[in-house]
UniProtKB/Swiss-Prot annotation:
Modified residue annotations for Phosphoserine: 129
InterPro entries: Aspartic_peptidase_A1, Aspartic_peptidase_AS, Aspartic_peptidase_N, Pepsin_A, PEPTIDASE_A1, Peptidase_aspartic_dom_sf
Peptidase A1 domain mapped to chain residues: 75-384
GO terms, biological process: digestion; proteolysis
Entry annotation: catalytic residues: 93, 276
Cystine pairings recorded for this chain: 106-111, 267-271, 310-343
Keyword Phosphoprotein annotated: yes
PROSITE patterns linked to this entry: ASP_PROTEASE, PEPTIDASE_A1
Protein's recorded name: Pepsin II-4
Species of origin: Oryctolagus cuniculus (Rabbit)
Subcellular localization(s) per the UniProt record: Secreted
Propeptide span(s): 16-59
Amino acid sequence: MKWLLLLGLLALSECIVHKVPLVRKKSLRKNLIEKGLLQDYLKTHTPNPATKYFPKETFATVSTESLENYLDAEYFGTISIGTPPQDFTVIFDTGSSNLWVPSTYCSSLACALHKRFNPEDSSTYQGTSETLSITYGTGSMTGILGYDTVKVGSIEDTNQIFGLSKTEPGLTFLFAPFDGILGLAYPSISSSDATPVFDNMWNEGLVSQDLFSVYLSSDDEKGSLVMFGGIDSSYYTGSLNWVPVSYEGYWQITMDSVSINGETIACADSCQAIVDTGTSLLTGPTSAISNIQSYIGASKNLLGENVISCSAIDSLPDIVFTINGIQYPLPASAYILKEDDDCTSGLEGMNVDTYTGELWILGDVFIRQYFTVFDRANNQLGLAAAV
């Protein structure tokens, strides 16, 4: 009888996980390469992962996320806004907290080439006088805030605040394979104090657990998911290892060390790391990343990519990240990105001056290997080997 009850509870827990499929598409970088525009783009837009995380203390109501940092984003999902629903392709980004999409208020070419939310076509839209601005490159995305029904998978939130863009200058969005961004970080870093989507889901009782989880498939097109309100154990092996969040803004944790072949190569006295679905690559201090690139034989090409011979993958060592006493090895098949006959390093350097010392960003390169649970109720991350 007890076993029947347990099985019933397990079945119930699976039923209340709201799964949102993600599709893997060509990144903005790949689109620009195909059109022969990447070199021109990089002359005026310099991707710097650090700018996504540290200018926010300077601006109380203006978000200063550098949108060039979505240059390599590949995983996208569909949401709808309004009544009747208007569909948008977005990045589910654990490294930011705002939801915004292009709108009919925007007349720039970048907006014209993407889906635009039309508030006049929604019977449930409520406007505000509040503004939103996100700076990037040579200009900024400016917009206004409004409320409407937002549907994410099977979850319908009837009172969600979001940004409607009015200007989107430059090439950053012209060829972007997404319309907007849905932030899943903590509300403390939300621009204009806008309540993040997941916080609203929980506050309104739309999910049964105050957590969400992410599975990123290595499949070229399908299989990836964001799961709201629960955990599906069929997407990982072994047990989840829990890591306390060290800063309740980003999904930031303390990492013990980074090693190769048993030798510590970085983060010798522990360091901070941010687990970020909105960052495609694995990012660390420039000196440490440069040493790793040299070790694995990667060298920059004319487009600034760190290329490597595909034949070397089988002979390269694991990069081991030790977190909360548990080792998380990253094999070369994970940190070397292969497309057709070309191979590039999935590692990227950045310099950040923080009071906590060196900082690493564990992006999609890491998350593809490790199923990740973002547990807001207990302010912790769960990690387990992905299937």
